[in-house]
Structures are given as C-alpha cells and as structure tokens.
Regions:
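A generic structural motif
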Residues: 46, 90-92, 134-136
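Export/targeting segments at the very N-terminus of extracytoplasmic proteins
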Residues: 7-65, 153-156
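Catalytic and binding regions of secreted/periplasmic enzymes and modules that target cell-wall glycans
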Residues: 98-156
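Hydrophobic single-pass membrane-targeting/anchoring helices
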Residues: 1-5
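Peptidoglycan-targeting cell-wall enzymes and recognition modules
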Residues: 14-27, 38, 64-123
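Flexible domain-boundary/linker segments
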Residues: 56, 60, 76-77, 125, ...
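Soluble periplasmic/extracytoplasmic beta-strand elements of cell-envelope proteins
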Residues: 56-58, 83-85, 129-131
Length: 156
C-alpha cells in the first residue's frame, strides 16, 4: 500500500472530475522530465495552482510528448513549435520565445486564466479553449500522467 505524504497535492484537487476516458502513458526521458519540472516551476511563478500545472502538462503531453520541438519541416503543423506547439503566426510569440519552456508555459497559462471557470471544467475543455486543436478530446488521455507528474515534482 502506498503511503501518501502530507506535502503532496491531493489527487481530488489535481483531478477534480475524475479522468475522462482511456488514459495514455509514456515513459519520460531526462529531457521530458526536465520539461515537466519547468512547466511546474513556471506555473508556481505565475501564482497558479497544481490544477493549472496538470492542465499544462497534459496539454504539453498531447502536443509534443513533453519534447521541446523545433520546426519539423514537412511534418510540422503549420509553424507550430515548442512544448505546446504554439504558433508565431497566431501571436504566441517568436520562435525563440515559444521554444523557451518558461515563456511557453506562461503564455499558455495566460490563455487559461482568460477562460472563465476553467478550474471547474473537464481538463480537455479547458485545454481546448486555449489551444483550439483540431482534436479537442485528445487532451483528456494525459490527465492521470500529468497529475502523477505534478504529485511527484510539485514540491521537489
């Protein structure tokens, strides 16, 4: 039986609606783990809570598998780059900015803050409102892994 440490965020706060649908999980390498930690650090720096970090990490898992992607040539979705696959042509920032994990996370969170009631929405709806993806339901599959990462790294 796992022992829950008092200083770890509670799962009911991280996943207030329960996970939506089937969950995916990938093994993370050191770079991907560092990017998850960078998202958490940027979330804390903006004064947002653990749920915001879960939404952010789940979004980055869907968009880039937590890899800070540069331009992929023919495989690129328009001019999308970075952890959140943000587009310079859509006003997210310069290529240099959106491939900086702190900047990209802060930009995503700025968008999330503008979504009325995001804290009470299912993760996939909150993420989709910011990202405007062609696949709006795909964010939900990463909620458990994102919550696990926040639990593991929020206080580290």
């Amino acid at each position: 039986m796992a022992v829950v440490q008092a200083d770890k965020p509670a799962m009911d706060k991280l996943i207030p609606h329960g996970v939506q649908g089937d969950q995916s999980r990938i093994d993370l390498d050191d770079e991907q783990t560092a990017n998850a930690k960078a998202i958490i650090a940027a979330t804390k720096k903006t004064g947002m809570d653990e749920r915001a970090a879960v939404v952010s990490i789940a979004t980055a898992l869907q968009e880039s598998k937590l890899e800070n992607l540069g331009h992929l040539g023919d495989r690129n979705d328009h001019d999308s780059q970075g952890l959140f696959q943000q587009r310079p042509s859509s006003g997210w920032g310069t290529v240099e900015q959106i491939t900086d994990p702190e900047y990209a996370t802060t930009a995503f969170l700025k968008g999330l803050k503008q979504v009325d009631g995001w804290q009470d929405m299912p993760l996939t709806k909150a993420a989709q409102t910011v990202q405007v993806s062609a696949y709006p339901d795909h964010y939900a599959q990463w909620e458990q892994q994102a919550a696990d990462l926040v639990t593991q790294h929020w206080n580290s």
